[in-house]
């Protein structure tokens, strides 16, 4: 069997250049998979940069990762007063509207308002 190198050269499987690139590729992909955070792109920020971000108070949660991915896909953020409504919240509101109707959505809004005002 033959392999094609990155420079376009065709070589046999037992060529040492094929073995070194295959070993390098598999070790770097395993290292990148285990060291990067969930949702981080390959070649993205390493563990040191993520730890530095965590020390600066950057809160990482599944919802923030999902929001970032949805914004990258084109879902808009919109503003309600001085609050930013994230895409996950918009999708949740649409889901609640479909499942519970307008009355259910108003009930959920009332519960949110009461809980938000009771924290003050």
From Swiss-Prot:
Membrane topology value: Single-pass membrane protein
Keyword flag Transmembrane: yes
Predominant location: membrane
Family named by the database record: Belongs to the FAM241 family.
Known function: May play a role in lysosome homeostasis.
Alphabetically ordered keywords of this record: Membrane, Phosphoprotein, Transmembrane, Transmembrane helix
GO cellular component, one term: membrane
Protein name as catalogued: Protein FAM241B
Source organism per UniProt: Mus musculus (Mouse)
Pfam families listed in its UniProt record: DUF4605
Modified residues (Phosphoserine): 61
Family annotation (InterPro entries): DUF4605 (IPR027953), FAM241_domain (IPR052502)
Region named Disordered: 12-59
Biased composition range(s): Low complexity: 19-39, 47-59
Source organism phylogeny: Eukaryota, Metazoa, Chordata, Craniata, Vertebrata
Compartment list: Membrane
Membrane-spanning parts: 91-111
């Amino acid at each position: 069997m033959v392999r094609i190198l990155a420079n376009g050269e065709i070589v046999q499987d037992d060529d040492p250049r094929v073995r070194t690139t295959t070993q390098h590729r598999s070790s770097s992909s395993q290292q990148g998979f285990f060291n990067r955070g969930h949702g981080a792109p390959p070649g993205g920020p390493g563990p040191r940069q993520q730890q530095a971000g965590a020390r600066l108070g950057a809160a990482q949660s599944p919802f923030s990762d999902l929001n970032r991915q949805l914004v990258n896909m084109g879902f808009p953020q919109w503003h309600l007063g001085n609050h930013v409504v994230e895409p996950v919240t918009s999708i949740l509101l649409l889901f609640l509207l479909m499942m519970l109707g307008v009355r259910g959505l108003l009930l959920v809004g009332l519960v949110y308002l009461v809980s938000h005002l009771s924290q003050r």
